[in-house]
């Protein structure tokens, strides 16, 4: 992927090898020159080839630290494709070629001519290769860097030459006085370019070495100045910081380290549209980005591309430190590689507790601090006076345990700046007056904070830090925070794995090394200080371009974090020292940015096309309607006024006598403009009617005003009289109208409506607005629910509400939904049935009770199943399951009468047309074993053994599990052979006892339970039981269910001890009914369950 990016910026050519080859050749000469300068042995071994290379090809003195250093810098610059290195090497090759040509013209000895010819051939080949590969040296140096380094080099060489001249005057050896200055100049300033034989005599060896060292020192100082000039540009301008703060206002919640992007010893590069940015430092040739890009994640790729282009431009190696998983993935997609660097410790105050064995150490530390009289106070930085902030800064400096402030990706590096007013200060105060410790945390979005600074006085009581962190979590609600980042611990996994029992030798060695270096860098201390709070560990990554660059990226990270301090480095709090604004010109032109670095005047998308990118692209019709709305507001028209009730519904207006004045409101579905006369179709919940607008009858405005203002779908209110138009249509003859709701999105086709079923589910509000059938369905559902309630209440049943959130998964065999309550740190279930609570009411003496409410089952979704559904459960004391056969039939028939006007279900024919099916009268009743026998053509009953049942299943092609008992196998046969094949409503009774854990055994038939299921057209509508009231037997059955649940069965019920204790107080003989109301509505209306529900669950888009 990296190669792809480079090829895109610089097309592939046959000369891409030249920079690396040139760097290797010069690097080898530099290495040999260095070795020869320190080792007489090496100098002796390479004397002959060195002299040939020195005479005819390339300057190669016998001893010169300075020249070795020069060549090393040149080799690195060539490999980095620096354009300035190309100029230097090409110029040198041209000069050397001219020197050889001159030697050929003056030479009179053949062996000298041969050497010069070889050298000239090499130079010409090198010059040709360099010229052809010129475009491969694209990397530039920072503006001004070369001039500063050159001036420093000239000054250093001058000073070194003068000092060397003085040493030669004091210790000349055999060197003649007239040659001493020129010898010093040659050794220091010319890097021993002239042969030593050109001078009369020679100095002492030590003085000669010192002269070479002076030249090397001048070069090294120049290199430091070169690097320092790069670091001096590691600085934000005020406008850049202002732009970054604007991005943080919008997207700061994405990254806990985002606020540290405002650190002012970083530079920044923006995406072209200004909606994302990357902050970075340049250290030892590595452009080191910190954390994730700041801003809109959709613009991260553009920001990363701009950053990588900058790296290529200057020949820097790209590196990233502290990226999140999301950020690392974005960098990987741009061609970098990711390596886990450590883990960030995140505390969630809602889950934080001091109780529990794992928090014992923290709890004890907090107790000690409180006993020592330590209290904690919280203040935002803006709440501190200048004197108080000065005191805070003084404490921070006095309590720092290092000479310089450390940090790059996890530290802000400043205190007391007015721009950081939202930072949070946590102080530990002993005895009410003395501050003994402090935490400073920067904002993490609007509801989080990220640790920036932690200080404690040497005399602070033990446990002070633990007390501050704990109080921060416990008082988080009053502070307005819901997440806290303690920043990340580097190499956390290495500490954990190396300390585990059975850790391998490599893991233990790696941990030992980290512990050793922790004496200086506090790696283990940071890990352990965070670990004790039981945080959530979130991985952080380092990113690099090539594995060979990992050491360089590591060194750059160590320098940037302050663990290794280079000469002339500046890491103290600074004002804005950047010279060039990096923010895009379009963003600067808005005038929003501030030169003092404070947040922009108006927070929002910026840059070319940013407004369009910030939200989904709006369709043309929506943009037209938005423009109309804007024009209305400009004219002072309220498109969404306060409501006033109309005098009539549309249905009432249609029924009114001619000439009746009415005020109706509704949605405009159609409009026809005939020039001066306009007709529209207006619909409210009750009906639809025509409205007629005539310029001659309108009291205010004209029909043109109407067409200019109103679109199809708008809500309007009209006032007029009922009458006939010229064509005889019964209409509202409008005299006044007003807009009461502007529809910003167009309605679907006026004749077809929403034809896609998925669209109808997702946009039910639109479906209801335009589809009469959808309105009739919701009316039918309401009528069915009302009829069920009315029937039960008419029989003396009491309606109740029981908990939806339940601690025990029980009441039915089904897979539940799991949730969690933070207040009690407790897992809860969404109820799968209200049964167990309703039975508690029965124990308490409520003899007729029902609940019509929502239940939840984490199971499949199809035409007859929805995870959230409406369930009726009813219980009648002193009754049994036979009572509910007539009771259930009456409920459903009454519901059908309420919805359809007669006792009918609607069923689709083969052509899709719905036809009524009569359900009046009594319904069939069959036993389960009898129905299965009828379907099999072979008799079975409760005494049929398991082997026979399995054989019959194999014969019928019905699958079963080996651990099922006979009852479970019969139930599976019933579901496949009977339930799925049933058409007209039928009650199937007397189910096997083993599959009915809450049902009493049959009073006369052993092995079956008094239970029936009502099935119609393959759909189970309801079930009823003679309830099991024996608490001993009930406990035994639930214990069996709980064993199944413990064994991994997700549908088995858990043991509800509170319910069993309630049953031990005795429940009267009771018959219970459970009915799926959604399925009843489905069969009554002839539609699928998704059509009958106003808002069924739909997959995310």
Curated annotation (Swiss-Prot):
Protein residues bound to Mg(2+) 1: 1013, 1020
Record's bilayer topology term: Multi-pass membrane protein
Cofactor(s) it depends on: Mg(2+)
DNA-binding region: 662-740
Annotated localization: Cell membrane
Xref: PROSITE patterns: AA_TRNA_LIGASE_II (PS50862)
Segments for region (Lysine--tRNA ligase): 602-1101
GO MF: ATP binding; DNA binding; lysine-tRNA ligase activity; magnesium ion binding; phosphatidylglycerol lysyltransferase activity; tRNA binding
Cofactor binding, per record: Binds 3 Mg(2+) ions per subunit.
Alphabetic keyword roster: Aminoacyl-tRNA synthetase, Antibiotic resistance, ATP-binding, Cell membrane, DNA-binding, Ligase, Lipid metabolism, Magnesium, Membrane, Metal-binding, Multifunctional enzyme, Nucleotide-binding, Transferase, Transmembrane, Transmembrane helix
TM region(s), chain numbering: 18-38, 60-80, 84-104, 113-133, 151-171, 183-200, 207-227
Keyword set includes Lipid metabolism: yes
Family, similarity comment: In the N-terminal section; belongs to the LPG synthetase family.
Role played: Catalyzes the production of L-lysyl-tRNA(Lys)transfer and the transfer of a lysyl group from L-lysyl-tRNA(Lys) to membrane-bound phosphatidylglycerol (PG), which produces lysylphosphatidylglycerol (LPG), one of the components of the bacterial membrane with a positive net charge. LPG synthesis contributes to the resistance to cationic antimicrobial peptides (CAMPs) and likely protects M.tuberculosis against the CAMPs produced by competiting microorganisms (bacteriocins).
Stated name of the protein: Lysylphosphatidylglycerol biosynthesis bifunctional protein LysX
């Amino acid at each position: 992927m990296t190669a792809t990016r480079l090829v895109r910026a610089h097309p592939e050519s046959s000369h891409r090898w030249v920079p690396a080859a040139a760097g290797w050749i010069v690097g080898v000469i530099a290495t040999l020159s260095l070795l020869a300068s320190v080792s007489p042995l090496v100098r002796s071994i390479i004397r002959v080839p060195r002299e040939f290379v020195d005479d005819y090809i390339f300057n190669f003195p016998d001893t010169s630290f300075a020249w070795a250093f020069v060549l090393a810098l040149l080799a690195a610059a060539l490999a980095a494709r620096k354009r300035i290195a190309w100029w230097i090497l090409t110029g040198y090759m041209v000069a050397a070629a001219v020197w050889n040509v001159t030697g050929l013209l003056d030479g009179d000895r053949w062996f000298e001519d041969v050497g010069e010819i070889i050298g000239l051939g090499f130079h010409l080949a090198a010059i040709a290769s360099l010229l052809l590969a010129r475009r491969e040296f694209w990397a530039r140096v920072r503006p001004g860097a070369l001039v500063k380094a050159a001036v420093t080099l000239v000054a250093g060489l001058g000073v070194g030459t003068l000092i060397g001249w003085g040493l030669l005057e004091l210790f000349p050896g055999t060197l003649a006085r007239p040659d001493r200055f020129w010898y010093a100049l040659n050794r220091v300033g010319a890097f021993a370019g002239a042969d030593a034989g050109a001078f009369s005599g020679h100095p002492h060896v030590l003085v000669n070495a010192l002269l070479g060292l002076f030249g090397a020192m001048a070069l090294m100082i120049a290199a430091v100045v070169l690097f320092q000039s790069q670091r001096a540009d590691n600085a934000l301008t005020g406008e850049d910081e202002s732009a970054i703060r604007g991005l943080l206002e919008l997207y700061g919640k994405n990254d806990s380290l985002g606020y540290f992007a405002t650190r002012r010893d970083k530079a920044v590069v923006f995406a072209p549209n200004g909606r994302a940015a990357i902050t970075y430092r340049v250290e030892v040739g590595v452009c080191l980005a910190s954390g994730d890009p700041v801003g809109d994640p959709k613009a991260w790729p553009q920001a990363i591309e701009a950053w990588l282009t900058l790296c290529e431009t200057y020949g820097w190696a790209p590196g990233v430190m502290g990226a999140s998983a999301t950020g690392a993935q974005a960098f990987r997609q741009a061609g970098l590689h990711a390596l886990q660097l450590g883990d960030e410790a995140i505390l969630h105050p809602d889950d934080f507790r001091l109780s529990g064995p794992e928090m014992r150490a923290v709890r004890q530390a907090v107790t000690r601090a409180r006993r020592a009289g330590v209290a904690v106070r919280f203040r935002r930085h803006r709440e501190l006076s200048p004197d108080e902030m000065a005191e805070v800064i003084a404490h921070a400096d006095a309590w720092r345990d290092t000479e310089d402030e450390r940090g790059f990706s996890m530290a802000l590096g400043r205190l007391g700046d007015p721009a950081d007013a939202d930072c949070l200060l946590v102080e530990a105060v002993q005895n009410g007056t003395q501050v003994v410790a402090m935490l400073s945390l920067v904002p993490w979005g609007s509801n989080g904070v990220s640790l920036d600074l932690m200080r404690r006085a040497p005399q602070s009581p033990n446990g002070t830090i633990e007390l501050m962190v704990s109080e921060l979590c416990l008082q988080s609600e009053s502070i307005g925070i819901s997440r806290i980042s303690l920043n990340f611990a580097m190499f956390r996994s290495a500490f954990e794995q190396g300390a585990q029992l059975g850790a391998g030798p490599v893991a233990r060695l790696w941990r030992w090394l980290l512990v050793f270096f922790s004496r200086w860098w506090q790696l283990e201390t940071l890990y352990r200080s965070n670990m004790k709070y039981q945080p959530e560990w979130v991985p952080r990554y380092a990113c690099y371009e090539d594995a060979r660059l990992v050491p360089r990226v590591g060194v750059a990270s160590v320098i940037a974090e302050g663990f290794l301090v280079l000469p002339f480095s500046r890491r103290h709090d600074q004002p804005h020292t950047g010279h060039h604004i990096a923010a895009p010109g379009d963003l600067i032109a808005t005038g929003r940015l501030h030169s003092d670095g404070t947040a922009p005047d108006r927070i929002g998308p910026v840059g070319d096309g940013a407004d369009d990118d910030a939200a989904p692209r709006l369709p043309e019709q929506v943009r037209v309607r938005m423009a109309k709305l804007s024009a209305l507001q400009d004219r002072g028209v309220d498109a969404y006024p306060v409501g006033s009730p109309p005098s009539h519904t549309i249905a009432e207006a249609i029924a009114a006598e001619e000439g009746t004045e009415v005020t109706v409101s509704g949605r405009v579905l159609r409009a026809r403009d005939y020039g001066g006369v306009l007709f529209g179709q207006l619909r409210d919940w009750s009906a639809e009617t025509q409205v007629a607008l005539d310029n001659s009858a309108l009291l205010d405005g004209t029909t043109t005003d109407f067409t200019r203002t109103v679109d199809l779908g708008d809500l309007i209110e009209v006032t007029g009289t009922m009458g006939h138009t010229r064509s005889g249509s019964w209409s509202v003859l409008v005299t006044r109208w007003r807009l009461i709701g502007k529809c910003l999105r167009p309605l679907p086709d006026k004749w077809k409506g929403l034809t896609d079923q998925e669209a109808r589910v997702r946009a039910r509000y639109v479906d209801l607005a335009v589809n009469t059938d959808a309105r009739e369905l919701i009316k039918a559902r309401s009528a069915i629910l009302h009829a069920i309630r009315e029937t039960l209440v008419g029989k003396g049943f009491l309606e109740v509400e029981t908990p939806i959130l339940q601690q025990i998964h029980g009441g039915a065999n089904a897979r539940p939904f799991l949730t969690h309550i933070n207040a009690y740190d407790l897992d809860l279930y969404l109820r799968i049935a209200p049964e167990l609570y309703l039975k508690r009411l029965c124990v308490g003496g409520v003899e007729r009770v029902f609940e019509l409410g929502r239940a939840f089952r984490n199971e499949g979704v199809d035409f007859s199943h929805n995870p959230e559904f409406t369930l009726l459960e009813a219980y009648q004391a002193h009754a049994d399951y036979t009572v509910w056969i007539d009771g259930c039939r009456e409920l459903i028939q009454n519901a059908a009468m309420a919805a359809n006007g007669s006792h009918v279900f609607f069923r689709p024919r083969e052509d899709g047309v719905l036809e009524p099916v009569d359900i009046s009268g009594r319904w069939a009743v069959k036993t389960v074993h009898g129905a299965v026998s009828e379907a099999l053509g072979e008799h079975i009953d409760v005494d049929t053994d398991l082997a026979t049942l399995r054989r019959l299943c194999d014969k019928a092609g019905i699958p079963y599990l080996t651990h099922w008992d006979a009852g479970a196998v019969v139930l599976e046969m019933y579901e496949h052979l009977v339930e799925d094949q049933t058409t007209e409503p039928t009650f199937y009774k007397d189910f096997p006892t083993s599959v009915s854990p809450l049902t009493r055994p049959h009073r006369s038939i052993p092995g079956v339970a008094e239970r029936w299921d009502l099935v119609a057209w393959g759909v189970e509508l309801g079930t009823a039981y003679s309830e099991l009231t024996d608490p001993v037997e009930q406990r035994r059955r639930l214990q069996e269910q709980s064993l199944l649940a413990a064994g991994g069965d997700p549908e088995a019920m858990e043991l509800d001890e509170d319910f069993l204790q309630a049953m031990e107080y005795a429940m009267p003989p009771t018959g219970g009914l459970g009915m799926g109301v959604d399925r009843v509505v489905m069969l009554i209306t002839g539609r699928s369950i998704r059509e009958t529900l106003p808002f069924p669950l739909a997959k995310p888009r």
